[in-house]
Amino acid sequence: MARHRNVRGYNYDEDFEDDDLYGQSVEDDYCISPSTAAQFIYSRRDKPSAVEPVEEYDYEDLKEFSSSFVNHQLSGIDQARLYSCLDHMREVLGDAVPDDILIEAVLKNKFDVQKALSVVLEQDKVQNLKVRSEGAISTGKIAKGKSIDSQSSQSESEIVPKVTKMTVSGKKQTMGFEVPRVTAEENGHSFHTPQKGHSSEDTSLVSSDALESASKSALPSHTIQASEEQSSTPTPVKKSGKLRQQIDIKAELEKRQGGKQLLNLVVIGHVDAGKSTLMGHLLYLLGDVNKRTMHKYEQESKKAGKASFAYAWVLDETGEERERGVTMDVGMTKFETKTKVITLMDAPGHKDFIPNMITGAAQADVAVLVVDASRGEFEAGFETGGQTREHGLLVRSLGVTQLAVAVNKMDQVNWQQERFQEITGKLGHFLKQAGFKESDVAFIPTSGLSGENLITRSQSSELTKWYKGLCLLEQIDSFKPPQRSIDKPFRLCVSDVFKDQGSGFCVTGKIEAGYIQTGDRLLAMPPNETCTAKGITLHDEPVDWAAAGDHVSLTLVGMDIIKINVGCIFCVPKEPIKVCTRFRARILIFNIEIPITKGFPVLLHYQTVSEPAVIKRLISVLNKSTGEVTKKKPKLLTKGQNALVELQTQRPVALELYKDFKELGRFMLRYSGSTIAAGVVTEIKD
């Protein structure tokens, strides 16, 4: 109880004798002299406030801004188009014009930026922008150090630069400013802007460059003259979101890569046919893999007990692929021939990784089919259950028309002509049935391990006595590149998404149509989100532009990485790609065991998208050659039939009609681990 007595009898008044007042000065008990106080005491009253008051936003203004969107019930695509138009108009007008006026102008002119700008700029509110610019120029003029009387004697026309002009015309609009040249006189320090003729369609704007030129008046005259001499030569406008220079893509494509044409090549074939070893040895012989790296691969493969896989490790970079000895994902690299720049894609051959193979084949222009010439190995890959047949059908269904068949491992059969002719006879008949022309298919005997007949014609007497054809590299160089869809709207299908070291994130994929420049605004579908292309990387090198056929990496800002998935398609906001869950298609049924009926579940493979789907309707059976309807509303579809069906996906998918975009109108249907049909989109429902 003593402890409780101590607590009850404790005198708390001793602890509260003096209050500690923090944050303000308390006078001491003794006085201090004024001089000492001025030297050591900080006076808050005499000093200006270091913290400026934060301007608070008016809730009513925000409410009015949000209500302007509510008043106009717009769809998701129209909202994206509206945001794109507002961004372009703000880049030109700045924040001088309220957003509600800009929105009304855009909606009245049906999302036409040219007409909307003309309407807004004709109003009186643009005059406020002109008044502010004149005040800024006059302020910079006083800073020159001249007397106020001499400044007022000059006429206002000599001080204020002429308002520059911006012309918006044509289908593609060029956002830019015409910068007036500023000249300085030694005596008067006056500015003169040469007069330029302008058309009636030109729209007046105060250029920010004109303000910068006026601020240069604080510099000496010889400095201004030196800057004029440097600016006398025309310099291209920097590629940015605000000022972007339009380029001639076709002319730039001819200049790029020394006049060499771009070709996308995919290597396909049955598992263990030697695809990675063949192309890895080809890259080593071309010098794309140095000797030091190759020696490292040889030593590491020997330690792992896979000495024959040394060249395959050039393309199989992951530890799991090297450990299993099987390619699992599409390996991509680049090499050059005499007339071509080849983007090489090494596709997996195992049946478990057919979806990855479809992704690589969908991005290819031509293909190399690798078959094993060993006894029993070719038959295992070519007969039922092998991947040689399925890969051949897949690449033909995905638009590949030119094919080189590399009959590999010919050294194991001592370069026998009989074995080569046996393989070419069986494969040639099958490829002709699959839709390949005989003139577009070439058979080449090779050896991936020894390097025979890869980049130079073989000198082996066992081969030269009966084969006089091209080597593999010469055959690849003789492929004809397809016609690129440069004039069509921009389309890029995302094959990978990753976080960049800097701001934003990166997506990789092949540009299927159109072209892109740094600073372009893009629309991602189906997420329906807009962003800006901050940077473009082609073959690990930064570039300012890229066109159809290029495999690029885009650095994007203004969007959350969570909203982008593999399979999303980037397009221009003005001409977006269509998004739907139901569409009609014409399909060709392959060799299937179970007939296709209404409600049949399938897996839709479209570019890099893999989406579950259901066949909702069987509309009609078509004639293979003429396309005429032979039977309406069939109850089932069997192998070899050509039919018109309606499919429905679980989630929205971005599609294009085959007649408009052949690259984006093809798809494959798989069921239970095998490909059952190939098709093209004929109608998009919703």
Swiss-Prot record:
One of its GO terms (biological process) is nuclear-transcribed mRNA catabolic process, no-go decay. Its EC number is 3.6.5.-. It catalyses: GTP + H2O = GDP + phosphate + H(+). The modification N6-acetyllysine is found at residue 624. The keyword Hydrolase applies. Residues 325-329 are annotated as: G2. SUPFAM superfamilies: EF-Tu/eEF-1alpha/eIF2-gamma C-terminal domain, HBS1-like domain, P-loop containing nucleoside triphosphate hydrolases, Translation proteins. Residues 447-449 are annotated as: G5. Residues 144-163, 188-242 are annotated as: Disordered. Residues 260-484 form the tr-type G domain. Residues 269-276 are annotated as: G1. The modification Phosphoserine is found at residues 49, 68, 118, 153, 155. GTPase component of the Pelota-HBS1L complex, a complex that recognizes stalled ribosomes and triggers the No-Go Decay (NGD) pathway. The Pelota-HBS1L complex recognizes ribosomes stalled at the 3' end of an mRNA and engages stalled ribosomes by destabilizing mRNA in the mRNA channel. Following mRNA extraction from stalled ribosomes by the SKI complex, the Pelota-HBS1L complex promotes recruitment of ABCE1, which drives the disassembly of stalled ribosomes, followed by degradation of damaged mRNAs as part of the NGD pathway. Belongs to the TRAFAC class translation factor GTPase superfamily. Classic translation factor GTPase family. Component of the Pelota-HBS1L complex, also named Dom34-Hbs1 complex, composed of PELO and HBS1L. Interacts with the SKI complex. This is HBS1-like protein. It comes from Bos taurus.
